[in-house]
Amino acid sequence: MKKDLLSIYDLEAGDFKAIFEKARHLKSVHEQGVAYTPLKGKTLGMIFDKSSTRTRISFEVGMYQLGGLALFLSNRDTQLGRGETVADSARIMSRYLNGIMIRTFSHLIIEEFAAHATIPVINGLTDLLHPCQILSDLFTIIEKKGSYERLKIVYVGDGNNIANSWINAAARLPFHLALSCPEGYDPDSGILDRGVKEAKEGVSLMRDPYEAVRNADVVYTDVWASMGQEAEQEARARVFRPYQINEALLSPAKKDAIVMHCLPAHRGEEITAAVLDGPRSVIIDQAENRLHVQKAILEILI
């Protein structure tokens, strides 16, 4: 693997296999209650400009279970919040730490940090991309379906960082990705154009969610308004209402289709409680797998 994991595009075919095999091993070891501490003596810095539940807990617990230490750093805890340059912070933290995970708004910040750091930098989430989530989702699909190859994976909702990262994944791996977003809420145009050109099994964007979901193996959604878009919540709710994942919208999907959501979910908005808690939903396993996949990433990179 490359030094950093900022995007799915940082991974080659062999890297996906290595991460998923390592995650499978780490999950088995965890379930057996066997101590496995390859990162003993190693420290991960975790920089958070955005609040988090799953990202913080999974990385912090993951480092602990691997024998290492995780340091939580908000923008109030570092000189980054007081005017120190990203480049200076990256160089200095590289002397203290063995790796950095960053959850921030601008993707440019994490790219600049990685350019000046001499230690691995992991993208815990930016407004543009969320690679760790998609890797965990792919691992979950392998567990539930045996493989993601040749499947039809459908994303319904806002063209946000999750949608962008799914497009990146479809350009690297052999599955068909269909996206359904309201007009004006499409994924990043540059990412979409590249994904359409490079996709192994095809990337398609359509307005009709029922047509998108037809014969789907996996149906995926996310919140309609991401962090920082709270002022748009009411307007977005009106636009996105036809894109709610409910029993009617799932009817064109395959009978054994699974439903995924990266969480947190707004029940009754992008997805109904009946579907979220229903037999097709794999959201709890999906959330758990953030821990195992990110542990695999940490062990490989650090």
From Swiss-Prot:
E.C. number(s) listed in UniProt: 2.1.3.3
Instruction: Give the GO biological process terms.
Output: arginine biosynthetic process via ornithine; citrulline biosynthetic process; L-arginine biosynthetic process
Note the Gene3D superfamilies from the entry: Aspartate/ornithine carbamoyltransferase
Q: Which residues bind carbamoyl phosphate?
A: S52, T53, R54, T55, Q79, R103, H130, P131, C132, Q133, C262, L263, R290
Look at the named UniProt entry and state the broad enzyme category this protein falls under: transferase
Protein's cellular compartments:
Cytoplasm
Q: Could you give a GO molecular-function term held by this entry?
A: ornithine carbamoyltransferase activity
Q: Which keywords accompany this UniProt record?
A: Amino-acid biosynthesis, Arginine biosynthesis, Cytoplasm, Transferase
Q: Tell me a GO cellular component.
A: cytoplasm
Pfam families, per the entry = OTCace (PF00185), OTCace_N (PF02729)
The reaction(s) this protein catalyses: carbamoyl phosphate + L-ornithine = L-citrulline + phosphate + H(+)
Q: Which domain of life is it from?
A: Bacteria
Q: Which InterPro entries would you find in this protein's record?
A: Asp/Orn_carbamoyltranf_P-bd, Asp/Orn_carbamoylTrfase, Asp/Orn_carbamoylTrfase_sf, Asp_carbamoyltransf_Asp/Orn-bd, Orn/put_carbamltrans, OTCase_ArgI
Name its pathway. Amino-acid biosynthesis; L-arginine biosynthesis; L-arginine from L-ornithine and carbamoyl phosphate: step 1/3
Record PANTHER family? ORNITHINE CARBAMOYLTRANSFERASE, MITOCHONDRIAL, ORNITHINE TRANSCARBAMYLASE, MITOCHONDRIAL
Record-stated family:
Belongs to the aspartate/ornithine carbamoyltransferase superfamily. OTCase family.
Role of this protein:
Reversibly catalyzes the transfer of the carbamoyl group from carbamoyl phosphate (CP) to the N(epsilon) atom of ornithine (ORN) to produce L-citrulline.
Q: Which HAMAP family match?
A: OTCase
Mind telling me what this protein is named? Answer: Ornithine carbamoyltransferase
Task: Provide the gene name from the record.
Answer: argF
